[in-house]
Amino acid sequence: MDCVIFEEVAVNFTPEEWALLDHAQRSLYRDVMLETCRNLASLDCYIYVRTSGSSSQRDVFGNGISNDEEIVKFTGSDSWSIFGENWRFDNTGDQHQIPQRHLRSQLGRLCESNEGHQCGETLSQTANLLVHKSYPTEAKPSECTKCGKAFENRQRSHTGQRPCKECGQACSCLSCQSPPMKTQTVEKPCNCQDSRTASVTYVKSLSSKKSYECQKCGKAFICPSSFRGHVNSHHGQKTHACKVCGKTFMYYSYLTRHVRTHTGEKPYECKECGKAFSCPSYFREHVRTHTGEKPYECKHCGKSFSCYSSFRDHVRTHTGEKPCQCKHCGKAFTCYSSLREHGRTHSGEKPYECKECGKAFRYPSSLRAHMRMHTGEKPYVCKQCGKAFGCPTYFRRHVKTHSGVKPYQCKECGKAYSFSSSLRIHVRTHTGEKPFECKHCGKAFSCHSSLREHVRTHSGEKPYECNQCGKAFSHAQYFQKHVRSHSGVKPYECTECGKAYSCSSSLRVHVRTHTGERPYECKQCGKTFRYLASLQAHVRTHAGA
């Protein structure tokens, strides 16, 4: 059973605002409140009404509730109960309308009475008066010093100010004061010293809808409790703790969802496929996979989404907004999931483990790509040349090689590259920078992939195994070269003479016979060579001398 605070579903007015409403608008208010209560009753919900000064209170099941809350429980078509005491009415007319008519008359008398507005009480206290009717005769509710009217909650004053929920001092917080009835925006800074709602913008329109706008990020809320929870998120306050593992949450709904991870409860089941979910929002999103519904449409490009979070993250690609910032390095991201994955680069966490070889990965996509090495699956096929890839990143890089576009050019030598990462690695050949150092032997590399392959010489790991002969390799390029020895494929062809090779390095060496390039120079005598092996043999002649 869910619990609902009355203020979350009620619409409050000050006496001045209520006086501006005509009879039709007041009737509309009563109808809305009655419909809300009826809907909550049909959902078997508790309605909590905040009060003050109550000592030990019990709900309708005899369970204790907090000292500053009272509980109203609407239980049926011809009665409702308050603190377990049932109110029954004459069984005349439509059974389902009796309690609503009675509540309507209560609201009507209280709302339209002149006495009810002399002391500045808002309509949210109508519920307090209804609850008060169920108290024993010896209960002594507080009495208003100006008009003599009795209320259980006596903390609201005739000044229009109400006590701050944090410190008890009178202030003009968003939940304590309402602006005039005309549509406007009014700054209401809180006067108390310890308030998280230090400065908010409170907007009220003639439709009686309230919008609580966060001064920090501009996000607006209709429900005050949702707004307060949002403000807490800026301050990092997590007041709801899990009794099982101690994890804390900003919102009670998040805690409820988390608890189900311990209990395994999945109350939301899809009627189409039987899949069950612990969270209603995940369930709703899943249902849309069956219906095809995509209610969230981007105003910038017209793209539609079935999931609000995907829609929100997409919109940020247009606005450039990156609200999720890393606390370690300051890098910002458009969505929390990207920030979470980035955080693993700092923590070193690798939660995704291969069941075949035990290797762990930081990202699920990396694990999927790795698994294809075991299965041999290569689902990404190039339409131009038919080459297949197991990793989407390598596939995208390969596709760009067909376009011939090389937008990244080296300022030192003019050499151009298709990828910015390739240019960065190349630039290090000019600067001599080698930021990747082996922890075992201290050898440094300009490229991380080179370090990764080097580390395997220490660990003895050979993850690349030939399916045909079982031979294993520590380097991907050696493995690919070996596989071509079985297939006879020679994809690297010289444009000058047409000679083909099974690996790109062999083609590069061959091309030097046409260009005359001799990139390997002896530092002692200045002699140049076409091949690295030739230079190494030459250097030995100096050492022997």
UniProtKB/Swiss-Prot annotation:
Record keyword Transmembrane helix present: no
Record flagged with keyword Secreted: no
Please give the superkingdom of this protein's source.
Eukaryota
Tell where it localizes.
Answer: Nucleus
Gene name, per UniProt, is ZNF77
What Pfam families has UniProt attached to this entry?
Answer: KRAB (PF01352), zf-C2H2 (PF00096), zf-C2H2_4 (PF13894), zf-H2C2_2 (PF13465)
A GO cellular component annotated for this chain's UniProt record is:
nucleus
Q: Which function does this protein serve?
A: May be involved in transcriptional regulation.
Q: What is the protein name for this chain?
A: Zinc finger protein 77
Tell me which UniProt keywords the record has, alphabetically.
DNA-binding, Metal-binding, Nucleus, Repeat, Transcription, Transcription regulation, Zinc, Zinc-finger
Ranges annotated as C2H2-type zinc finger: 212-234, 240-262, 268-290, 296-318, 324-346, 352-374, 380-402, 408-430, 436-458, 464-486, 492-514, 520-542
Q: Which GO terms describe its biological process?
A: regulation of transcription by RNA polymerase II
SMART domains reported in the protein's UniProt record: KRAB, ZnF_C2H2
Which family does the UniProt entry place this protein in?
A: Belongs to the krueppel C2H2-type zinc-finger protein family.
The KRAB domain covers: 4-99
Parts forming coiled coils: none
Classify the main location.
Answer: nucleus
GO molecular-function annotation terms?
Answer: DNA-binding transcription factor activity, RNA polymerase II-specific; RNA polymerase II transcription regulatory region sequence-specific DNA binding; zinc ion binding
Upper lineage is:
Eukaryota, Metazoa, Chordata, Craniata, Vertebrata
